[in-house]
Amino acid sequence: MAAMACRSAQAQAVKPVKMVIGPDGMACEYIGETADKYHVMCLDDGWVDKKGSRIEYWSPEKGKGWVCCRKADGKVNIYKSADAKSAVVGQLTNTKGYIPESAACMGLEKGWYKVNKDGVVGYVKARTAWWSAKSLD
């Protein structure tokens, strides 16, 4: 996805994003609805049957969504614990002209995102990262 709706949890409170979870488990942003279908936005807009689908509200505090490097053409460290003095266990990069690397958001506490990148769990300082309800992949 070339564009994403990223929000900085550090700069302002992030409002939960209304998501539709389809019968296949795919999550898309809610746009509207009819009597029997949800209008959603994933890579493009489309329609999902209400039957077998559900609505969820995603936010970093609920451990939903994705985290990526805030700095254009930069990188941020993923730390073992919510402390910049702890060991670095990974990084998220944002290379100009490419889709930024992302990690699954597992929560937000005291200015730190808890993330999972390729099975490695760690922490990213919220002021150095963006949060999005949509996957970047």
Q: Which residues make up each language-model segment?
A:
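Sec/Tat signal peptide C-region and signal peptidase I cleavage site
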Residues: 6-11
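Bacterial N-terminal signal peptides
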Residues: 1-3
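Short, charged beta-turn/beta-strand-edge "cap" motif at the junction between a beta-strand
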Residues: 102-108
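Boundary regions of SH3-family modules and the immediately adjacent low-complexity/disordered segments
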Residues: 13-68, 113-137
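SH3/SH3-like (including bacterial SH3b) beta-barrel domains
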Residues: 14-24, 29-32, 80-94, 100
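Bulky hydrophobic/aromatic "packing anchor" residues in well-ordered structure
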Residues: 76-78
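Short polar catalytic/cofactor-binding loops
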Residues: 24, 73-74
